[in-house]
Amino acid sequence: MGIKFLEFIKPFCAVLPEIQKPERKIQFREKVLWTAITLFIFLVCCQIPLFGIMSSDSADPFYWMRVILASNRGTLMELGISPIVTSGLIMQLLAGAKIIEVGDTPKDRALFNGAQKLFGMIITIGQAIVYVMTGMYGDPSEMGAGICLLIIIQLFVAGLIVLLLDELLQKGYGLGSGISLFIATNICETIVWKAFSPTTVNTGRGTEFEGAIIALFHLLATRTDKVRALREAFYRQNLPNILNLIATVFVFAVVIYFQGFRVDLPIKSARYRGQYNTYPIKLFYTSNIPIILQSALVSNLYVISQMLSTRFSGNFLVNLLGTWSDATSGGPARAYPVAGLCYYLSPPESFGSVLDDPVHAAIYIVFMLGSCAFFSKTWIEVSGSSAKDVAKQLKEQQMVMRGHRETSMVHELNRYIPTAAAFGGLCIGGLSVMADFLGAIGSGTGILLAVTIIYQYFEIFVKEQSEMGSMGALLF
């Protein structure tokens, strides 16, 4: 059934725009250049406002998710990477449930990737329509059909650009993937801004700076009671404070520490005697994929809940999914869930919120740990990183595990890889929850994504350096 499904969509995949694989090896300097160009295009799109919108000042239901989804309110990057990640989530669940079967051949993998791209474009159109029709840019009846269509076209073209930029890097022209690059850039930008923002906010205590570090020096300079000034700088509510910054640095350090956890399986060459090596199985075997897919799941649930609550406010089933309230204190207007399923799947705002509503905290912990472990374990089956796939790769390289025949390698790898995937996903979820409870800037999920992505780029850089010979050869 799976192959028939992939064959069915093959004609549609043929008309999709595609980046061709490079015909030659791309040098490191060229990869850096293409990565920089990709990032520049993304940042420019983040600053270009959508033409035709009447207003983008309404409460933002996706405020908490924008950092993770690399989206920017009211701009071409309104949707961010959400369509790509959502299509990946859908295809993974379909493949994991054996509704579609993905073979080991390059043809099947190419069809699977094409189907993912096709779904990404369909989801882009769907999300654009939902955003416009729910009144995020003004009343659709007042804007008119022409303006609504124009906004949808802009969002679709921007979504297509993101898809192609991601494919450009994944095909080998740049470093890493577009999704990772955009997420890390957005999160790091948010952390730096929350630490050093010169924007002033009027609070009940007077005018304060948004940036935590600037606010610290401002409060010390303007308050006569220095102890009280320090207390305000460390514990102030609704604005970034020094404790949030310390929690962020602490989570960075913890995640980097866990990145080094791995099991090295001894392997040897089947062709040359005396040639030994190791195959590392990391604790974070599937890296940040579980948390990205979990974020996509929650963000789409938010979209559906917000759309239904706008149209059918007061309906029992809609309220069961989520009820929303607006908040404007300490920043831009944002909508947040106050009851229903969406509320229990959203992170508590602080450790104080955990104590106020322990049931909310408990459900959130179970959801985060369970979903991350599930996504991590199912991802290895569709991404070519299962025990069977690894054994096949080792066999192609004429490597075998020491003390095991080729036929028993899959069984031995099965002892480690599924466990590492599930436990690694569990740890990813646990670290994200810890960061949320500590109040880290950019959300626990955001911090975790930033660290894992930066670490991935560090590993890519080291790999390129070893291939080129020296850092001097890399840069000059």
Swiss-Prot record:
One of its GO terms (cellular component) is endoplasmic reticulum membrane. Coiled coil: none annotated. It is a multi-pass membrane protein. SUPFAM superfamilies: Preprotein translocase SecY subunit. The keyword Protein transport applies. GO terms for biological process: pronephric nephron development; protein targeting to ER; protein transport. It is found in: Endoplasmic reticulum membrane. PROSITE patterns: SECY_1, SECY_2. Residues 54-76, 139-144, 194-240, 310-354, 442-445 are lumenal. It holds the Pfam family Plug_translocon. Residues 2-33, 97-117, 166-172, 262-288, 376-420, 463-476 are cytoplasmic. InterPro entries: SecY/SEC61-alpha, SecY_CS, SecY_dom_sf, Translocon_Sec61/SecY_plug_dom. Keywords: Developmental protein, Endoplasmic reticulum, Membrane, Protein transport, Translocation, Transmembrane, Transmembrane helix, Transport. The SEC61 channel-forming translocon complex consists of channel-forming core components SEC61A1, SEC61B and SEC61G and different auxiliary components such as SEC62 and SEC63. The SEC61 channel associates with the multi-pass translocon (MPT) complex. Belongs to the SecY/SEC61-alpha family. Component of SEC61 channel-forming translocon complex that mediates transport of signal peptide-containing precursor polypeptides across the endoplasmic reticulum (ER). Forms a ribosome receptor and a gated pore in the ER membrane, both functions required for cotranslational translocation of nascent polypeptides. May cooperate with auxiliary protein SEC62, SEC63 and HSPA5/BiP to enable post-translational transport of small presecretory proteins. This is Protein transport protein Sec61 subunit alpha. It comes from Notothenia angustata.
